């Protein structure tokens, strides 16, 4: 498989004819309902034989296919790199030999839709973390979920279901609830026991702790709670995963509640939420810039074994009205819908080489200018390359109902997915 960047005058028909792929193939893999593609749009071409184009080089072809140049040369010993002929056929070597896991979050809808989505994603999934149970100040689990169908389907499809436990309230993630639980030994033990009972009685394979906005004052207590929970779950053969905000140093005041080294020594896996560097309340910019993801990984692997680390990627972006006015809020948009929006408004897509992130601008019916940052097959491919480069455990995503049609194809290209 390789990626074609749409140029001026390109159509799906002309691109398909160029490479020997049908329009339906290209539309299906990329999830396109319409055909009015725009310059700069990245299209995944689902072929393992590349047809050389005028002025192509082997280096350029390797970059399009996201494969090492040496591997491309080795797969095509009869090809002279200095005398490529237009129309020649180049074999794209498989690089799926890296065994990796995946962990994605899923917000329940209803049993029928739960079964359908899980069945769709199961071939490309190791674990699915079902969202979400939330906690009370006394350590109780404060809600119930209709999760039986989702749990049953995941196991049937050789995927491990994890229960996501959060500190969510109607007002968002609550620092205070976590503080109350952690500072009360009775409540803390009660929560550990309640999580164990939930996992064991509902039939989960483990748990993902997603406590956000933990205060610096509770840093050591939080790590101690995770150790206590690990010991309880381990006795039953259950997995403990934690979702943590991305950190590039220990000197970020609002992230001091997370002791990466201490947490990494306790949990089975650490899901790093490597997104929202720019968010709904910020100025426009890349949501998951590769520069910051790389800095996060390098900070993390100095303290946490690389095979415990899962890099979480966003299946969404944001649509800002510009010029940006402080206090305004951007609209969240799925990556798939962002591409559809660029096509609807015929907005050329640009790509930041520094951040490895796509973006575009368009004018709406009211004449307002918008700027949209999102993820496409190029930026996702770079993130998957980084998993391989740093020998990480897995890649993950928030969250599956947002969808990203080329995603499973990319997973199959870069990895052999570990199954139960």
UniProtKB/Swiss-Prot annotation:
Keyword Transferase recorded: no
UniProt keyword annotations, A-Z: Carbohydrate metabolism, Glycosidase, Hydrolase, Polysaccharide degradation, Repeat, Sporulation
Any one GO BP annotation for this protein: oligosaccharide catabolic process
Matching InterPro entries: CFLE_GH18 (IPR041704), Chitinase_II/V-like_cat (IPR011583), Chitinase_insertion_sf (IPR029070), GH18_Domain-Containing (IPR051887), Glyco_hydro18_cat (IPR001223), Glycoside_hydrolase_SF (IPR017853), LysM_dom (IPR018392), LysM_dom_sf (IPR036779)
UniProt GO MF annotations: chitin binding; hydrolase activity, acting on glycosyl bonds
Superkingdom, natural source: Bacteria
Annotated ranges, domain LysM: 2-45, 48-92
EC numbers: 3.2.-.-
Name of a matching Pfam family: Glyco_hydro_18
Cleaved signal peptide residues: none
Class in the EC hierarchy, top level: hydrolase
List of catalytic residues: 212
GO cellular-component term (any): spore wall
Disruption of the gene: reported phenotype: According to PubMed:11011148, cells show no effect vegetative growth, spore resistance to heat, chloroform and lysozyme, or spore germination in the presence of L-alanine. According to PubMed:12177332, cells have no detectable alteration in either dormant or germinating spore peptidoglycan, and germinate normally.
Family assignment from sequence similarity: Belongs to the glycosyl hydrolase 18 family. Chitinase class II subfamily.
Note: Transcription of ydhD is dependent on SigE. Cells producing excessive ydhD do not show impaired spore resistance, but their germination properties change: spores show reduced response to L-alanine and some of them germinate even without germinants.
Protein name from the UniProt record: Putative sporulation-specific glycosylase YdhD
Protein's gene: ydhD
């Amino acid at each position: 498989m390789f990626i074609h960047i749409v140029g001026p005058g390109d159509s799906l028909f002309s691109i398909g004819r160029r490479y020997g792929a049908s329009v339906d193939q290209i539309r299906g893999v990329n999830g396109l309902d319409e055909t009015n593609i725009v310059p700069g749009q990245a299209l995944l071409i689902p072929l393992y034989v590349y047809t050389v184009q005028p002025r192509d080089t082997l280096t350029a072809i390797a970059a399009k296919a996201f494969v090492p140049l040496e591997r491309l040369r080795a797969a095509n010993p009869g090809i002279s790199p200095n005398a490529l002929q237009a129309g020649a056929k180049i074999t794209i070597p498989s690089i799926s030999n890296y065994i990796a896991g995946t962990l994605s979050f899923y917000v329940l809808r209803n049993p029928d839709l739960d079964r359908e989505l899980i069945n769709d994603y199961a071939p490309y999934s190791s674990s699915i973390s079902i969202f979400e149970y939330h906690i009370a100040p006394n350590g109780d689990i404060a809600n119930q979920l209709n999760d039986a169908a989702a749990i049953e389907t995941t196991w049937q499809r050789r995927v491990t279901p994890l229960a996501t436990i959060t500190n969510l309230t109607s007002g968002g993630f609550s620092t205070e609830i976590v503080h109350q639980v952690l500072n009360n030994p009775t409540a803390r033990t009660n929560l550990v026991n309640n999580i164990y009972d939930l996992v064991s009685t509902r039939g989960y394979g483990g748990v993902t702790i997603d406590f956000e906005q933990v205060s610096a004052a509770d840093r050591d207590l939080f790590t101690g709670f995770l150790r206590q929970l690990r010991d309880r779950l381990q006795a039953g053969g259950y997995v403990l995963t934690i979702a943590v905000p991305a950190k590039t140093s220990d000197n970020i005041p609002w992230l001091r509640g997370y002791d990466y080294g201490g947490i990494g020594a306790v949990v089975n896996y650490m899901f790093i939420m490597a997104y929202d560097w720019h968010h709904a309340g910020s100025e426009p910019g890349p949501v998951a810039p590769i520069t910051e993801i790389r800095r996060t990984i390098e900070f993390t692997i100095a303290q946490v074994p690389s095979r415990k680390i899962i890099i979480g990627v966003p299946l969404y972006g944001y649509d800002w009205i510009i010029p940006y006015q402080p206090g305004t809020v951007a609209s969240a948009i799925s990556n798939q819908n962002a591409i559809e929006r660029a096509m609807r408004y015929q907005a050329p897509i640009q790509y930041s080489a520094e951040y490895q992130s796509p973006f575009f601008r368009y004018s709406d019916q009211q004449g307002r200018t918008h700027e949209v940052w999102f993820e496409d097959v190029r930026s996702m491919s770079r993130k998957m390359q980084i998993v391989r480069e740093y020998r990480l455990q897995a890649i993950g995503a928030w969250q599956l109902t947002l969808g990203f049609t080329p995603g499973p194809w990319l997973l199959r290209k870069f990895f052999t997915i570990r199954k139960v």
